[in-house]
Amino acid sequence: MGNAYLGGWRRRVFWTLIALAIPALIAVCVESWRQMQIASSRAELDDACERARVDVLGGMTPAQFTQSRVKGTNGYERLRKLAEAIDNAPPIGPGTFEAADDSEPFTPMGVSKVLGVQEWPRLKRDPPDAEKTRLFLAATEAWSAELEEISRCDVIAQVIHDVDTYGDLLGGDSLTWLQVHLRSLWFMLARANGHALIGDGEVAARQLLTIARLYSLMRVPLCELQLNTRAWGISSVLNLALHWVKEGRIAAAQLKELTSFNMDCEPLLPVAAKGEMASKILFEQWVQEWPSEVWFGWARPDIEDSPFDDGDRQNKYTRGIRYREGWTTGLRTYAAQVLELQDQSPPYIVRTADQQGLVMSANLQAASTRIHSQQVEIDAVRAELLKLMAK
């Protein structure tokens, strides 16, 4: 009896230990598998990044590559500081600034949004208060002179520094490149439109020429977005000049210098694509560190894992690895597309991405189409201006 009881107790202890050991063993196996998956995804991403760096950037780091493209004096930092000053400037006076059914605070930035963003025909139909326009022009004269000096630099280009992270590339604690661009463009267009509205055509023409010079210097874009904004800015300047000449507000001869500036945008697509490659390699450092755990692939095969989507609680188990895997495929495809561009001439043909969802590759394909249509428009308006100047 005693022996039977002792044997039963031992069996219970044995199975209890087995019951405790199996989950622990499974946890160890899953953790080991998890670490293998993480290490594998990081190794694949490293390989794709290194191949892109060697094949596209000639073996240089993103900082070395972007800095090597800039020759002479670079006016970007001066432009950024001026944009920050415009952004943070106090009110010029009380109340608001209104024109063309638009209203903003009576600050340099507010006036820039009204006079710089609205198209000329609308401003002409519904002009702002002339006295407030004069106050704005007087209050911002020093900034205008600074932009005139910046336009005499050799180039305006954002570069990557040795200690930069991807967050620094996006602006860090300062303005992003796009914000710098928009604030300076809106500001100068606002001053040009302001002078034209109060009848000072000669100064308006000088302001327009300064904007055109600034855009002619933005010939080393760091991404397709920067190339697109260059094209948009040049198009805006040319169309505004055409309006003024046709209306007789300024003489075509006053803008003769305008047509001598470098207005090529489409030929810069390979330059922008290589710059984008440099920024994506910098971004890879952040992707490498994305925290993740692995969940069994069959657990939720239907979910779209994204590091930016916390809607599904199980995303946290797979999103890091899947994101790295997607980024690896994207880098390889994008690098191949960039290299294909180097042997072409406009209009460029960008092959379709061979895997659905490769956003960076799709962006390059869309950029090639968009930039081509913008270049056609720029060339057409420029040709029309040349005809008016020849009369």
Regions found by a protein language model. Name each.
Residues 2-391:
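Short acidic linear motifs
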